A protein has these predicted regions:
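Extreme N-terminal leader/targeting segments of oxidoreductases
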Residues: 1-33, 52-53
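Short hydrophobic core segments
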Residues: 34-37, 61, 203, 210-222, ...
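Glycine-rich FAD pyrophosphate-binding loop
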Residues: 51-72
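Active-site substrate-recognition segment that forms the wall
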Residues: 48-52, 76-78, 112-116, 209-210, ...
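Helical element adjacent to the flavin cofactor pocket in flavoenzyme catalytic cores
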Residues: 160-206, 210
Length: 378
């Protein structure tokens, strides 16, 4: 599904928008050392990491425009530390490492990737509103301290305050990375693979065959291609987000469960789980519920208009963790899928894992956590 209605494209420069539709040349007969299939943030970050590691000629192909799917509909929040309340340790370790890689990219690339550093404040009626496990790097605030940061709450709240988290405009990050890739072709769909023994020897596309040295599938959900014997359980989960009109109300970064302060005095909120809704349309009742929920916590926001509203489908595996693995039975094919709510956050670390695996034959730490076979036979 191509995401429409999100704010992110409107924030881009003309040059950044042009990169999202970049198409360098035809693909028929191409023989890249590395072929990356998928032009969301994970695919683009992987292609960038492979090129940066000197893995040879790297080609990325994408069915539509870069970032047109779940990437373009994401909130772009980079908040590993709050995940300590909900995610297993290997996942949190990956998230922390990935935020550091976002910071590295911001420093290393001319103009950066659009990383914005900001703090996270989680609200609760009392500290037992958080899990008994108390994460590191958390400042526990009493209701008076919370009220100083967020005046006008509907009721006294305690809070968990975490500094130095981040966010990006996901399309800007894609455009900044993709601008430095050696070869990108949009508007080309992978349709099939040809396997000889334990190797992919050809990837069929809507524009002809490609013969890669290695291939990485980063297509959101696991690839479903003729000739590729791969069956990993997954689903897509719809979610809604919105951005408000400009307001003089300022939040101290991300305030959960209220909103995130973004540019131009606007607030970003939402991130629903609309399980069972397979329609591509924005549902007005869901948008109304989001705005009502925000106003119930912070009444000052009641009546604030909605400037942007959109929905997207996020890929999810049964355990809500991604797959980062070799394609079972093949020595020159990798895949990553099911990043669900953390694809933007985890893209650079996932890319680093894959490029290191390809170049040094070193799988990730705790490989079982990311295995394609953890659900049974693929």
């Amino acid at each position: 599904m191509t995401v429409t209605g999100a704010i992110w494209r409107d924030q881009l420069t003309a040059d950044e928008r042009a990169v999202l539709g970049r198409s360098d040349s035809g693909v028929a007969g191409a023989t890249p050392d590395v072929l990356v299939v998928g032009g969301g943030i994970v695919g683009v970050a992987t292609a960038f990491a492979c090129a940066d590691a000197g893995l040879g000629a790297v080609l990325l192909i994408e069915t539509g425009r870069l970032g047109a799917g779940a990437t373009g509909g994401a909130a772009g929040l980079l908040i590993p530390e709050p995940h300590q309340w909900s995610d297993p340790e290997p996942f949190v370790d990956l998230e922390r490492a990935s935020l550091e890689r976002w910071r590295d990219l911001q420093r290393a690339l001319p103009g950066g990737v659009g990383l914005v550093e900001l703090d996270w404040l989680g609200l609760a009626p009392h500290d037992s509103g958080f899990a008994a496990h108390q994460p590191r790097d958390v400042e526990w605030l009493n209701p008076g301290q919370v009220a100083e940061l967020v005046p006008g709450l509907a009721r006294p709240m305690e809070g968990a305050f975490i500094r130095r988290q981040g966010r990006v405009n996901p399309l800007r990050a894609v455009a900044r990375l993709a601008a430095r890739l050696p070869a990108v072709v949009t508007g080309v769909a992978a349709t099939s693979v040809t396997i000889s023994g334990d190797r992919v020897v050809s990837v069929g596309t809507s524009s002809g065959a490609i013969s890669p040295g290695v291939v990485v599938f980063a297509t959101g959900r696991p690839p479903m291609l003729d000739g590729l014997p791969l069956h990993i359980p997954s689903e897509r989960v719809k979610g809604h987000l919105l951005v408000t009109e400009r307001t003089g109300i300022r939040l101290p970064g991300i305030v959960a469960p209220v909103a995130t302060q973004i540019e131009d005095g606007r607030l970003l909120t939402g991130g629903t789980f609309d399980v069972g809704d397979e329609t591509p349309a924005v549902q007005p009742d869901v948008i109304d519920a989001i705005t009502a929920g925000v106003a119930a916590v912070l009444p000052r926001l009641r009546g604030l208009g909605v400037a942007y509203q959109w929905c997207c489908f996020r890929p999810r595996h049964p355990d809500s963790r991604p797959v980062i693995d070799k394609v079972p039975g093949l020595v020159n094919a990798w895949l990553t899928s099911g990043h669900f709510r953390t694809g933007i956050l985890n893209a650079p670390a996932t890319a680093a894992v894959l490029s290191r695996w390809m170049s040094q034959d070193v799988p990730p730490v705790d490989a079982r956590s990311w295995s394609a076979t953890r659900f049974g036979a693929p």
